[in-house]
Design a protein with these regions (language model features):
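Conserved HGGG/HGGXW glycine-rich cap/lid loop of the alpha/beta-hydrolase fold
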Residues: 26-78
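Active-site loop/oxyanion-hole signature of alpha/beta-hydrolase fold enzymes
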Residues: 55-58, 67-107, 111
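Short beta-to-alpha linker loops that shape the active-site pocket of alpha/beta-hydrolase fold enzymes
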Residues: 70-74, 136, 244-245
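Residue in the alpha/beta-hydrolase core beta-strand immediately N-terminal to the catalytic nucleophile
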Residues: 105, 128-131
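Hydrophobic, aromatic-rich cap/lid helix
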Residues: 165-202, 206-215
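Conserved loop-alpha-helix segment in the C-terminal half of the alpha/beta-hydrolase fold
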Residues: 208-244, 253
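Post-His helix in hydrolase/transferase enzymes
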Residues: 249-262
Length: 266
């Protein structure tokens, strides 16, 4: 069915474009390679900028139309009064509408993967498929989880500005970073039913080992939460489990991610 539907609002080739897309009280930095290929929209990790996708995009090549953007207060985008998950979902609307994209493949890493599930659940006719990179329906929840996350970001408060130029932190306070993460954990943990009802092809590429702030074995426990989803929804498939960790998966295992995108785009 995906091969019989136009991916954009026009049959003409889209022009390459870089600029700012206004939404709510802010503006998002967007890059669009243009072309006549299937649009692929990349959704970043919670505090990451679009540059982390460079190797994946280079591996896929110019046959696809690659659209990246920086979320609010990340990368080159402007700050906002609203950094909520719902605001991030609205940002996907704004970017696709601004670029005239009717239907796309969503590729999301970590936070971006959870965004992709929920946006697809709400907009199934606008999504050809989803590639999820090391996200899972699992999270640190409740008061204990929230307190642990707040303590982590409080300890990191002096490090965050130093990592920002490398696309690893946002122009937010440590407390704002923590609140983004607390909300993500609550939403991710409740997302199993969302994944189980998706009717678009969803491919997972998952990492191995731990990530920043996780306890030993915690990330592998999170990844096992996908097993019931794979069993209950044939549209959701494990494409690859790779050797790199959560932080390095885009830079080290980009070929596996590209293969999953090609499978959806075929």
């Amino acid at each position: 069915m995906t091969n019989t539907v136009n991916y954009s609002t026009s049959n003409s080739t889209a022009s390459a474009w870089t600029g700012m897309v206004p939404v709510d009280d802010t503006a998002l930095y967007v890059t669009d390679t243009g072309g006549s290929g299937v649009p692929v929209v990349y959704l970043n990790g919670a505090y990451a900028d679009h540059k982390h996708w460079r190797k994946v995009i280079a591996e896929l090549g110019p046959g696809l139309r690659h659209i990246c953007f920086d979320e609010r207060a990340r990368g080159k985008s402007k700050q906002s009064a609203d950094y909520s998950f719902e605001a991030c979902l609205r940002d996907i609307d704004a970017v696709l509408d601004a670029r005239g994209v009717e239907r796309a493949i969503l590729v999301g890493w970590s936070y971006g993967g959870v965004l992709a599930w929920h946006w697809t659940d709400r907009n199934p006719d606008r999504v050809a498929g989803v590639v999820t990179v090391d996200s899972a329906p699992y999270g640190l929840t409740g008061p204990e989880g929230a307190e642990r996350i707040r303590k982590l970001f409080h300890r990191m408060r002096f490090l965050l500005p130093l990592t920002r130029p490398f696309g690893m932190a946002a122009r937010m306070s440590a407390a704002e970073h923590a609140e983004v993460n607390i909300e993500l954990n609550e939403i991710a943990d409740a997302s199993g039913p969302v994944l189980e009802r998706l009717r678009r092809p969803v491919r997972f590429v998952v990492a191995t080992g731990n990530s920043l702030g996780s306890e030993d074995g915690e990330m592998e426990k999170a990844r096992t939460s996908l097993e019931p989803v794979f069993a209950n929804n044939p549209n959701v498939v494990l494409s690859a489990k790779v050797s790199s960790n959560h932080s390095k998966i885009l830079s080290k295992d980009f070929p596996a991610i590209a293969d999953a995108v090609r499978e959806i785009a075929a």
